[in-house]
Amino acid sequence: MIEMNAVVAGTELDAARDAGREGASAGWCAWSAGDASLTFSLIVRPDVNMHAFHGLPFVAAMGMMDALVGTASTPGLGLAGKVGIQWSSDIVCGAPAFETSLARVAVNGGAAAAGMFGAVTVDIERSALGELGVDVADEALVETLAAAVLALSLIHI
C-alpha cells in the first residue's frame, strides 16, 4: 500500500529520507506536481544488505515499465512499444529512436534505528506524458507507478 504525502516541489527526496530515518514503512511516498514535471520519492525497505542496493535503480525502472506497459496480470497504461529503459534506469519514449526522456530514476540509500531503506526518486517529464497521450490524474499516476516500483523492489532485490 502506498502512503501518499504531497510536498513542495523540490523537497521530495529530503522528505523521503527524513521519513525513512524516522522509521516510515516501505510504501511511504512524497510527491509533487510542478508545471514541467511530476516527481515522487518512495521509501523501499528490501530485505538485503546495503551492498545489494546497487541494483535498485534498474529494478525501480522495471517496476515503472510494468506500470506503463503492463504485465500478464495487469493492463498498465497501454504504452507497449512506446517506452523503454535507457541503461541503467531512465525511462525514454519516442519510438523508434527512443530519444525523449520520460522519467529519470535515482536511488539514495540510508539507515537508521528502523534499518536500511532506499529512497527511489522518479522525475517524470510532463511534456513526454502529453506526447504519449497519458491522461491520468497526477496523484493516481504517482500511486500507480509507486506501487509497481514497490512491488518489484520487494521481489527482485
Language model region names:
Residues 43-47, 88, 108, 123-125:
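Beta-hairpin (beta-strand-turn-beta-strand) motif
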Residues 1-78, 93-99:
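N-terminal lobe of the biotin/lipoate ligase/transferase fold
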Residues 32-34, 84-86, 111:
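Short, ordered beta-strand-loop transition motifs
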Residues 24-25, 79-80, 112-117:
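Short coil/turn connectors at secondary-structure junctions
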Residues 155-157:
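Conserved small/polar residues in nucleotide/adenosyl-binding loops
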Residues 106-140:
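Short, acidic (Asp/Glu-rich) active-site segment that either coordinates a divalent metal cofactor
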Residues 61, 137-153:
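Short amphipathic C-terminal alpha-helix that caps PH/PH-like domains
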Residues 76-99, 104, 124-125:
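Catalytic palm active-site di-aspartate
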